[in-house]
Amino acid sequence: MDIKDSLYIFQGVCTNVVDGDTIDVILDLGFKTSAERRLRLINVDTPERGQDNFREATNFTKLCVEGQKIYIQTYKDDVFGRYLAKVYYNSDNEVRCLNDDLKTEGLLKPYSKWNKK
């Protein structure tokens, strides 16, 4: 599947990394329309400020997507008004899923109910 041609996946740019699982983006909605949104990565929960591995998870997310063109598959919004999303990015000409990579790198908060397989 070519991610650029998939329905319901938006192209955007990550403008800020709040923490390992929350980013700010400018979404390209098409027809010369864009929107700024805060996204929460779906099915992953990284450590919060002051917790072990907060800096590592945040820096990993920054390295992968900050300032980069990304692809975003959105779901519903959460109780804080952030859209839940899967975020895809290019790494060495390979499309990667940030949500999956945070899991693979072992950067999730242990025993969190929000971490799903």
PLM regions and their residue ranges:
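Small beta-barrel nucleic-acid-binding modules, primarily SNase/OB-fold domains
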Residues: 1-117
